[in-house]
């Protein structure tokens, strides 16, 4: 794979107004993508965004670039990332574009692309777009310029799609649900989905103003959700991130239920109903208790690198349909082609209704092991993880933890840092083990 200049693991991302998230660059990105994608046929590209104020500027720039390349843009307005994956498929579009920086603050933004199949663009297509960006920009003749249109019923279409994944014979009419939409793209989706399935819904984080996305709310900050669940005596709390591809839950006691526990609940339910195809993909950061709980059920488990892109790649490699991260990206591949917070929450709610069990009862099978994380800074040069002394200490700790825990040592890709992670049933042993390894790293 060629070295990337602009595309990271999740498209092009950065601070608004700083290269490359500038109007002129994004216009050219729209043009370059249009030139590469225009070979497909339908001539239309879907553009969705989250609720950041910069989304207006960036969608206009993309539209101009696409039009110059001869492609038409169809705008959905604020829409979750997984909704764009779904709508791109149903509209038979050349591609889908999402303007979002996910869980980042409002002053960041990004551009990511979906293929006509609703999956991330293949590497060779991203590389072709990067190569096109190096060419001088031109414009098709006037008669071939693209147009712009708006899909007025995009939200309704996606709401119906989400509801179609919930068993028709079940209802949420006995449930009180607090929904936190992070003042992001699910603000007009998730509350309506839950209400239309019968739930009593209490909303927080559903008043976007362009600048309050992810601010003290959503999947990355659940304190307000926990308080509201307890205050209103709700059955469950749901927290999405700014673009709706992550889910974190809160039980009726106010306890956090993370992505590992959510993944287990969905996997066990799929196994019971005979819909689990193969096993489950987690990441290097997935809690060991998830692995052990799945093992007890006879469900295979493999770890991918951190990042939903890598989870999906591993799922495709094994031809499995379920994967996710502890951060709350949950991919149910027979329902959508990317992580989908709303659909993941419906899968858990269906299990609650079906078995008349609380979220707390469903999640109790995965008692998360304490994780201790220590970041150790080192002087540039040799990688301390290659030192014999560090390897010896790591091996000794692994023997002590045998079967009861695990260690993960990683060098940061962006800073001179070694990340030491120790996970163990015994919190004190985890802390002592992590400090022992960190000390060995510092001494080398």
From Swiss-Prot:
Activated by phosphorylation. GO terms for molecular function: magnesium ion binding; phosphoglucosamine mutase activity; phosphomannomutase activity. Mg(2+) binds at residues 102, 241, 243, 245. The active site is at 102 (phosphoserine intermediate). Binds 1 Mg(2+) ion per subunit. Its cofactor is Mg(2+). Keywords: Isomerase, Magnesium, Metal-binding, Phosphoprotein. One of its GO terms (cellular component) is cytosol. PROSITE patterns: PGM_PMM. It comes from the Bacteria. The keyword Cell membrane does not apply. Transmembrane segments: none annotated. InterPro entries: A-D-PHexomutase_a/b/a-I (IPR005844), A-D-PHexomutase_a/b/a-I/II/III (IPR016055), A-D-PHexomutase_a/b/a-II (IPR005845), A-D-PHexomutase_a/b/a-III (IPR005846), A-D-PHexomutase_C (IPR005843), A-D-PHexomutase_C_sf (IPR036900), A-D-PHexomutase_CS (IPR016066), Alpha-D-phosphohexomutase_SF (IPR005841). The keyword Membrane does not apply. GO terms for biological process: carbohydrate metabolic process; peptidoglycan biosynthetic process; UDP-N-acetylglucosamine biosynthetic process. The modification Phosphoserine is found at residue 102. Its EC number is 5.4.2.10. It catalyses: alpha-D-glucosamine 1-phosphate = D-glucosamine 6-phosphate. Catalyzes the conversion of glucosamine-6-phosphate to glucosamine-1-phosphate. Belongs to the phosphohexose mutase family. This is Phosphoglucosamine mutase. It comes from Histophilus somni (strain 129Pt) (Haemophilus somnus). The lineage of its organism: Bacteria, Pseudomonadati, Pseudomonadota, Gammaproteobacteria, Pasteurellales.
């Amino acid at each position: 794979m060629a070295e990337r200049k602009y595309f990271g693991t999740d498209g092009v991302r950065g601070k608004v107004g700083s290269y490359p998230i500038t109007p002129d660059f994004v216009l050219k990105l729209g043009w370059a993508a249009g030139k590469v994608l225009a070979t497909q046929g339908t001539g239309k590209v879907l553009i969705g965004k989250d609720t950041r104020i910069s989304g207006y500027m960036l969608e206009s720039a993309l539209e101009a670039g696409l039009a110059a390349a001869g492609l038409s843009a169809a705008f959905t307005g604020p829409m979750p990332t997984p909704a764009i994956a779904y709508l791109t498929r149903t509209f038979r579009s050349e591609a889908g574009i999402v303007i979002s920086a996910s869980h980042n603050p409002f002053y960041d933004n990004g551009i990511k692309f979906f293929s006509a199949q609703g999956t991330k663009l293949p590497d060779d297509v991203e590389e072709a777009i990067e190569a096109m960006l190096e060419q001088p920009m031109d414009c098709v003749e006037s008669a071939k310029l693209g147009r712009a249109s708006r899909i007025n019923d995009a939200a309704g279409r996606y709401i119906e799609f989400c509801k179609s994944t919930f068993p028709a014979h079940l209802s949420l009419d006995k449930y009180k649900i607090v929904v936190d939409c992070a003042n992001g793209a699910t603000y007009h989706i998730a509350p309506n989905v839950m209400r239309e399935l019968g739930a009593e819904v209490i909303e927080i984080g559903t008043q976007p103003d362009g600048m309050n996305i992810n601010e003290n709310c959503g999947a990355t900050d659940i304190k307000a959700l926990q308080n509201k669940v307890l205050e209103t005596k709700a059955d469950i709390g749901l927290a999405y991130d700014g673009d709706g591809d992550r889910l974190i839950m809160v039980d009726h006691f106010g306890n956090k239920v993370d992505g590992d526990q959510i993944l287990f609940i969905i996997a066990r339910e799929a196994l019971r109903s005979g819909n689990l195809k193969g096993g489950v993909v987690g990441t290097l950061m997935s809690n060991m208790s998830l692995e052990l709980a799945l093992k007890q059920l006879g469900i295979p488990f493999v770890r991918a690198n951190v990042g939903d892109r890598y989870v999906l790649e591993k799922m495709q490699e094994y031809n499995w349909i379920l994967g996710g991260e502890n951060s709350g990206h949950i991919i149910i591949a027979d329902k959508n082609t990317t992580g989908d917070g709303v659909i993941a929450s419906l899968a858990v709610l269906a299990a609650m209704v079906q078995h008349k069990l609380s979220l707390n009862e469903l999640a109790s099978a995965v008692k998360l092991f304490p994780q201790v994380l220590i970041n150790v800074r080192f002087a540039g040069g040799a990688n301390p993880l290659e030192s014999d002394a560090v390897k010896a200490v790591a091996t000794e700790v692994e023997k002590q933890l045998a079967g009861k825990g695990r260690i993960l040592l990683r060098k940061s890709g962006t800073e001179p840092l070694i990340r030491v992670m120790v996970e163990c049933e015994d919190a004190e042993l985890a802390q002592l083990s992590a400090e022992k390894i960190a000390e060995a790293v510092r001494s080398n």
